[in-house]
Amino acid sequence: IYDERGIRENAARLKQAFSWNKGYKEYFAVKATPNPFLLNILKDMGCGTDCSSMTELMMSRACGFSGPDIMFSSNDTPPEEFAYAKKLGAIINLDDITHIQCLDDITHIQCLEETLGHIPETISCRFNPGGLFKISNDIMDNPGDSKYGMTTEQIGQAFKILKEKGAKHFGIHAFLASNTVTNEYYPMLAKILFELAVKLKEETGVHIAFINLSGGIGIPY
């Protein structure tokens, strides 16, 4: 049983909390609760979807999400999924620098009757700072052992390559921890990513269009 009124109230509170930022948008991780009824409620409240598989992309499309209201992040991605995400106009978030070549190599996928053939003008890359991610005296996660994301050197190189291939608007994403209930998590994550944004802007000259603070607001079970 789900509390629709509670879901709508919480979504409205979150939106109001960030009303000072006109570019703010909440992306709900479909994997968390792949329920089309809940997705429709969140769509009605102005949220987008965060997808990591073909199934989640298809569900988002079936619920009426399209374009930049969908963000696609995957770390072991078949070409078909990249092509489908591009077909929907989703923001593609690259987990590995080798994915650039994968995108560039896709020219035609018969089963989708869709051509890609070029790098999207808006693209995102997932960052992994390495080491340990600590809040206060607690270790929240160990990005150094994570399979997700690019190093500082890799993401800088990736931005340069993507810029040369026609990308114009860049995003930065990081997945350092999930279900955190401390107030320290997002300020620390934001500090890491905004400092990286300045560094990448200075080194590559790209336009940093957005930063995705992932991980989700935790639930005190």
Located regions from the model:
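ATP-grasp fold ATP-binding core
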Residues: 122-128
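Soluble or luminal CAZymes and related metallo-dependent hydrolases
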Residues: 6, 95, 150, 154
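Active-site loop/helix belt of alpha/beta enzymes
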Residues: 129-221
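A signal for specific C-terminal beta-sheet/loop modules enriched in small/flexible residues
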Residues: 70-75, 128, 177-178
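A charged N-terminal "starter" segment
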Residues: 1-91, 97-102, 106-121, 160-164, ...
